[in-house]
Amino acid sequence: QKAVAWAVHGFTTSGIVLGFLGLVAVFEGKQEVAFIFMALALFVDGIDGTLARLAKVTQVTPQVDGASLDNVVDMFNYSVLPALMIYWFEMVPEQFLIPAAAAILAVSCYTFADTSMKTSDYYFKGFAAFWNLLVLFFVLLETSQLTNLITIVICCVLTFAPIKLVCWLVSR
């Protein structure tokens, strides 16, 4: 049972390795490859919680805080990597590249530290740091730099809004 629990922790941790490979792809200018690694990391994040509950990792490996591990990996994949993509691929006007990326990182720190981020009925309160999906939409919809900047500002503000958003991505 311990081996299974540790394997689940390893699986969760593989998400940050996938994110790192996405980071390398960004630095190599391979946007599509970065999105592939981002998607693989999203897949890992989508099932690791279920696997953790099935393996009872909290009871079997109590010395490892799986929620903290998941938050570290998520912060990287949902916030750091997308912020870098916005900067590297110049998705906002040049004078706002650093402020936009910095704003994403700053509000994401709050998001991942907010213990009330997930509501009791499985919604997220405010914008839940889905910057990876937002960046994908920017590319797929070929939105303008100004549209992207305005969207980023709105999502940053929505991070602090006391409204429920996006329930279908939350593992129950």
PLM feature spans:
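Short, amphipathic, aromatic/basic-enriched membrane-interface segments that mark the entry/exit
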Residues: Q1-G10, V64-N71, M117-G126, W168-S171
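Juxtamembrane loop-transmembrane helix junctions in multi-pass integral membrane proteins
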Residues: K2-W6, G29, T61, D65-S68, ...
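Helix-coil boundary and interhelical linker segments in multi-pass alpha-helical membrane proteins
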Residues: L21-F37, V72, F76, V80-A102, ...
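Alpha-helical transmembrane segments of multi-pass membrane proteins
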Residues: M38-D45, I104-D114, I152-P162
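C-terminal ends of transmembrane helices
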Residues: T50-Q59, C109-Y122, F160-V170
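C-terminal membrane-associated helical module and adjoining short loops/tails
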Residues: D121-R172
